[in-house]
């Protein structure tokens, strides 16, 4: 049953017929359970299919939506009176326009040079959520900080919408370093990065090669390539992976015929008053953040093109963590985070200097926005000591 729950999301990405027929096929052909999954799991599956995910759909946002940048404060957090804020745009090396929020200390003397930090959002998130909280708070503490929307997502450009790519998402960190290094008030020798959730893996991978990044911190890090290839807790068998890849491969033909890539199921397009009953703990946790007023944002739909899955299965992230040394790495993880093993395993592979910092009582999503739990003093000290 646990394995059944862990892989429901993967299954939902590839099958889009009637829920009852899907579940029977899922249990019999993929897991050989012959209808023995519990009624609890079946109900959860139906809940995921009908409530959490509104069904796989075609690409949701056009380029016209991307070009109309909002000028109002539309964040999930309050605006600080201790910082200055502006929306900026620049291009990555693929020519994709990246839209970002730039936070600087209030009344900053631009004739001086300041340390700078790039902040990447959780996988499927946007700059108006957790990444913005980190950027604004670090600006309050004296850093120039940039929170960006990844390529193809949020307000950033790129067609088709909601593509997910290990290469390009890593490149987005380097493009942010490009932008910051062109600002007269940024010290090019004092640029660090913060990656939250999936961006933690992208940030580490960018740092492996990009020598301009002098220090890197991750919060609730997710290794998206490992999760896609192996399933959560490495539960996906070789047979299951092959079946999954066959479905994704065929999806490319369907996308080519339609001229529009199909998306994985997405979150509701309006905030929910309460978390649906019957969800497994991991799904319920993500619902708590992304689908309620706590973290809901209309541009954070939690979906990507189905064909994007193939690249993450094919191209692993963080293969050369030891090469980041002698630049320092700080892994921050919640004591009760379901994703904790990603950071622990990456920590083992990394070379010194490195630190694994565990936040007592914190779950995975709590390090997105719980300012009472996020160790900002620790982050400030880490970057002050290493961006010098």
Where are these regions (language model features)?
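The serine-hydrolase catalytic nucleophile loop
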Residues: 124-136, 150
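Short beta-strand element of the alpha/beta-hydrolase
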Residues: 112-122
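N-terminal cap/lid segment of alpha/beta-hydrolase-fold proteins
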Residues: 69-112
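Alpha/beta-hydrolase-fold enzymes
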Residues: 204-287
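Conserved alpha/beta-hydrolase
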Residues: 137-155
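Alpha/beta-hydrolase active-site loop
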Residues: 163-184
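Short beta-strand/loop motif that positions the catalytic acidic residue
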Residues: 331-333
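Catalytic histidine-centered segment of alpha/beta-hydrolase-like enzymes
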Residues: 362-373
